[in-house]
Amino acid sequence: MTKRILMLEDGNYFIGDAIGSEKETIGEVVFNTGMTGYQETITDPSYYGQIITFTYPLVGNYGVNRDDFESINPAVKGVVVREAAEFASNWRNQITLNEFLKEKGIPGIAGIDTRKLTKLIRKEGTLKGILAAETADKEELLHHLRSVRLPVDQVHEVSSAKAFASPGDGKRVVLVDYGVKSSILRELNKRNCYVTVVPYNTSAEEILAMHPDGVMLSNGPGDPKDVPEALEMIRGIQGKLPLFGICLGHQLFALANGADTFKLKFGHRGANHPVKELATGRVDFTAQNHGYAVEKDSLIGTDLKVTHIELNDETVEGLAHKEYPAYTVQYHPEANPGPSDVNYLFDEFMEMMNGKEEGELHA
């Protein structure tokens, strides 16, 4: 089997077996601790520009099926696994992981010590990495890797180019696409919502002209400070319409209301993150995928209150506006992959939109 190298910007490197596409690639090396859900993870637009390390030792054993994709075209740069299953065993399987990676042009590496790599990332933080042929000159690879700047226009790359509708006969929801997962759209469709998905740079005036019952801010990749156009839109919407944000949408909501965000050392990526609701003490296990978080101290003096925290590091996991029907969460209530403990948040959004009809808005 052809050999491949994963070179990190700190000079560490790993040599293993090549899987997927043969092309060379550069990205931010991160790790995901989920035991299952690799195909949802690989097709999640929030992973744009990243090389994903799966900590679970065997990946690909149940294959890949197109029904569970979170986007049509995966945006990941590469995949790292301890062992890639050569044969898939599942009645829904349509294609093996290796075949899928080749089809989508995603290079990968297998047979390396993913535990060692994960511990390295935990210690040093996320690092740039390059996947290349094992025969490549290591010094040249390292020099090239260190000279490359990772893109900052990630949301622009994964957002819808134009608005489109997913019809229903219930509440009318505008879903702002910063890299939305298909599962979020499906959760709204389950509740009979008429959903209009709009590009990330849609203005408040354009959204209000659609006369929706509520607005959702989706997940997405990268640094929220790279999407300044979203902040004015959020300020123009909150108080006029019920607002619900997820992941990147949560961070943008915080920035729009005067708070700050920061980059986590190695992020939260997995399906077992415990989150505590401060009002009730309820603890849920959640799916998470983010490299940035809201700075808790920056919320002092704003109109936002913390509703949820992550129990491992006490980072902010939920916010609510003190005056308006607007709330956001850092985690993923739609799951896929991960537990569906917090799926009820979509029902709370529906209740907020019902409150709009009853005149409960403060605008």
From Swiss-Prot:
<dbReference type="GO" id="GO:0006207">
    <property type="term" value="P:'de novo' pyrimidine nucleobase biosynthetic process"/>
</dbReference>
<feature type="domain" description="Glutamine amidotransferase type-1">
    <location>
        <begin position="172"/>
        <end position="359"/>
    </location>
</feature>
<comment type="pathway">
    <text>Pyrimidine metabolism; UMP biosynthesis via de novo pathway; (S)-dihydroorotate from bicarbonate: step 1/3.</text>
</comment>
<dbReference type="GO" id="GO:0004088">
    <property type="term" value="F:carbamoyl-phosphate synthase (glutamine-hydrolyzing) activity"/>
</dbReference>
<dbReference type="Pfam" id="PF00117">
    <property type="entry name" value="GATase"/>
</dbReference>
<keyword id="KW-0315">Glutamine amidotransferase</keyword>
<dbReference type="GO" id="GO:0006541">
    <property type="term" value="P:glutamine metabolic process"/>
</dbReference>
<feature type="active site">
    <location>
        <position position="334"/>
    </location>
</feature>
<feature type="binding site">
    <location>
        <position position="251"/>
    </location>
    <ligand>
        <name>L-glutamine</name>
    </ligand>
</feature>
<keyword id="KW-0665">Pyrimidine biosynthesis</keyword>
<dbReference type="InterPro" id="IPR035686">
    <property type="entry name" value="CPSase_GATase1"/>
</dbReference>
<dbReference type="InterPro" id="IPR002474">
    <property type="entry name" value="CarbamoylP_synth_ssu_N"/>
</dbReference>
<feature type="active site" description="Nucleophile">
    <location>
        <position position="247"/>
    </location>
</feature>
<dbReference type="GO" id="GO:0005524">
    <property type="term" value="F:ATP binding"/>
</dbReference>
<keyword id="KW-0547">Nucleotide-binding</keyword>
<dbReference type="GO" id="GO:0006526">
    <property type="term" value="P:L-arginine biosynthetic process"/>
</dbReference>
<comment type="subunit">
    <text>Composed of two chains; the small (or glutamine) chain promotes the hydrolysis of glutamine to ammonia, which is used by the large (or ammonia) chain to synthesize carbamoyl phosphate. Tetramer of heterodimers (alpha,beta)4.</text>
</comment>
<keyword id="KW-0067">ATP-binding</keyword>
<dbReference type="GO" id="GO:0044205">
    <property type="term" value="P:'de novo' UMP biosynthetic process"/>
</dbReference>
<protein>
    <recommendedName>
        <fullName>Carbamoyl phosphate synthase small chain</fullName>
        <ecNumber>6.3.5.5</ecNumber>
    </recommendedName>
</protein>
<feature type="binding site">
    <location>
        <position position="289"/>
    </location>
    <ligand>
        <name>L-glutamine</name>
    </ligand>
</feature>
<keyword id="KW-0028">Amino-acid biosynthesis</keyword>
<comment type="pathway">
    <text>Amino-acid biosynthesis; L-arginine biosynthesis; carbamoyl phosphate from bicarbonate: step 1/1.</text>
</comment>
<feature type="binding site">
    <location>
        <position position="220"/>
    </location>
    <ligand>
        <name>L-glutamine</name>
    </ligand>
</feature>
<dbReference type="InterPro" id="IPR050472">
    <property type="entry name" value="Anth_synth/Amidotransfase"/>
</dbReference>
<dbReference type="InterPro" id="IPR006274">
    <property type="entry name" value="CarbamoylP_synth_ssu"/>
</dbReference>
<feature type="binding site">
    <location>
        <position position="248"/>
    </location>
    <ligand>
        <name>L-glutamine</name>
    </ligand>
</feature>
<comment type="function">
    <text>Small subunit of the glutamine-dependent carbamoyl phosphate synthetase (CPSase). CPSase catalyzes the formation of carbamoyl phosphate from the ammonia moiety of glutamine, carbonate, and phosphate donated by ATP, constituting the first step of 2 biosynthetic pathways, one leading to arginine and/or urea and the other to pyrimidine nucleotides. The small subunit (glutamine amidotransferase) binds and cleaves glutamine to supply the large subunit with the substrate ammonia.</text>
</comment>
<feature type="region of interest" description="CPSase">
    <location>
        <begin position="1"/>
        <end position="172"/>
    </location>
</feature>
<dbReference type="Pfam" id="PF00988">
    <property type="entry name" value="CPSase_sm_chain"/>
</dbReference>
<dbReference type="InterPro" id="IPR029062">
    <property type="entry name" value="Class_I_gatase-like"/>
</dbReference>
<feature type="binding site">
    <location>
        <position position="291"/>
    </location>
    <ligand>
        <name>L-glutamine</name>
    </ligand>
</feature>
<feature type="active site">
    <location>
        <position position="332"/>
    </location>
</feature>
<dbReference type="GO" id="GO:0004359">
    <property type="term" value="F:glutaminase activity"/>
</dbReference>
<keyword id="KW-0436">Ligase</keyword>
<feature type="binding site">
    <location>
        <position position="46"/>
    </location>
    <ligand>
        <name>L-glutamine</name>
    </ligand>
</feature>
<dbReference type="InterPro" id="IPR036480">
    <property type="entry name" value="CarbP_synth_ssu_N_sf"/>
</dbReference>
<dbReference type="InterPro" id="IPR017926">
    <property type="entry name" value="GATASE"/>
</dbReference>
<keyword id="KW-0055">Arginine biosynthesis</keyword>
<feature type="binding site">
    <location>
        <position position="292"/>
    </location>
    <ligand>
        <name>L-glutamine</name>
    </ligand>
</feature>
<feature type="binding site">
    <location>
        <position position="222"/>
    </location>
    <ligand>
        <name>L-glutamine</name>
    </ligand>
</feature>
<comment type="similarity">
    <text>Belongs to the CarA family.</text>
</comment>
